[in-house]
Amino acid sequence: MTKETYVSATAVVSGSFLSGSMMSLSALVIPLFLDTIDDGPQLLRQWARLYHYGSIYMPALCVATCGIYGYVALSKRAAISPLWSPYVLAAVSTLAMVPFTWWVMVPTNNTLFGLHRSAESTELGVVQVLVVKWAWLHVVRSLYPLFGAFLGFRALIRELRT
């Protein structure tokens, strides 16, 4: 196996880890919050902290994963290999979660942050509905790096067969 094969595998693992980490927030953490928090402002505080830590780690991992896919694609293209384009598609698919966030998720995020900043007490039911909506949108966002990992894995398998 070549160095690029190891780097390709690293990109696939990184994208899979990113998707799994993101998915675990919607599949595990949000249900835990909903089951154990019975106060609207407290649920908003917990969601805001979850968002804070996620916004520190997840974008960095997304950029790193795209960078690794990009490195592999450029290496393949320089070597005149036809396997460069699947890695570009994997990078683009992984990065596509960013415009999805801007165009689809920001209104819900802004509403949750607005409620969090307000001094008045917020009804638990209102917050729960918004947090559940956010969780489902986050599931969809988590699929972008998963699809990128799938594309990268397919390219890696093709690479190993040649």
Curated annotation (Swiss-Prot):
Q: Which UniProt keywords apply?
A: Glycoprotein, Membrane, Monooxygenase, Oxidoreductase, Transmembrane, Transmembrane helix
Subcellular location field: Membrane
Pathway of this protein? Secondary metabolite biosynthesis
Question: Per its UniProt entry, which superkingdom is the organism in?
Answer: Eukaryota
Q: How does it sit in the membrane?
A: Multi-pass membrane protein
Carbohydrate attachment residues? N109
User: Where are the membrane-spanning stretches?
Assistant: 17-37, 54-74, 86-106, 130-150
Q: Which GO terms describe its cellular component?
A: membrane
Q: Which InterPro entries match?
A: Anthrone_oxy
Q: What is its EC number?
A: 1.10.3.-
Q: What is its main location?
A: membrane
Which terms in the Gene Ontology molecular function aspect does this entry carry? monooxygenase activity
Catalyses: emodin anthrone + O2 = emodin + H2O + H(+)
Q: What does this protein do?
A: Anthrone oxygenase; part of the gene cluster that mediates the biosynthesis of the tetrahydroxanthone dimer neosartorin, which exhibits antibacterial activity. The two different monomeric units appear to be synthesized by the same set of enzymes, among which the Baeyer-Villiger monooxygenase nsrF is the key enzyme for the divergence of the biosynthetic routes. The pathway begins with the synthesis of atrochrysone thioester by the polyketide synthase nsrB. The atrochrysone carboxyl ACP thioesterase nsrC then breaks the thioester bond and releases the atrochrysone carboxylic acid from AacuL.
The UniProt entry's sequence similarity note says:
Belongs to the anthrone oxygenase family.
Q: What is this protein called?
A: Anthrone oxygenase nsrD
